[in-house]
C-alpha cells in the first residue's frame, strides 16, 4: 500500500518538525514489520512543503501503524507545526528498481 502525505509546515518550526518526523519514521521502520519504507522530499522553491511517500505491506499494516504510541507521539508533537495536511491513497501502477535488472 502506497500513501502520499502532503504537508505544509510552519517554516519557523521546520527543523523541529524534521527531528520529530525522523524519530517517528526510524521507530516505525525498526519496530513495525508492515512499515516498509518512507521517502521524504521538500519542494525546492518552498522547503516548508513536504511530501512523504509511505509504503506499507497492506492496509492492515497502515491501520495498525496509526494506532501506535510512537505515531501518536509524533502527531501530538507536530500538531502546532503542521499548517495543512493532505493524505492521498494511491494504487500502484508499476515500480521498477535497479535490482530488477541484476
Label for each model-derived stretch:
Residues 1-31, 35-36, 40:
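N-terminal first-folded block
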Residues 23-31, 35-37, 55-89:
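An amphipathic, aromatic/His-enriched active-site/gating alpha helix that lines ligand/cofactor pockets
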Amino acid at each position: 500500500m502506497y500513501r502520499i502525505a502532503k504537508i505544509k509546515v510552519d517554516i519557523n518550526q521546520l527543523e523541529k518538525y524534521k527531528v520529530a518526523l525522523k524519530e517517528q519514521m526510524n521507530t516505525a521502520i525498526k519496530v513495525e514489520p508492515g512499515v516498509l519504507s518512507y521517502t521524504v522530499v521538500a519542494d525546492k522553491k518552498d522547503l516548508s512543503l513536504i511530501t512523504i511517500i509511505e509504503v506499507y505491506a497492506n492496509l492492515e499494516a497502515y491501520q495498525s501503524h496509526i494506532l501506535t504510541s510512537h505515531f501518536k507521539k509524533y502527531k501530538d508533537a507536530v500538531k502546532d507545526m503542521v499548517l495543512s495536511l493532505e493524505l492521498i491513497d494511491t494504487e500502484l501502477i508499476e515500480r521498477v528498481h535497479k535490482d530488477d535488472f541484476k
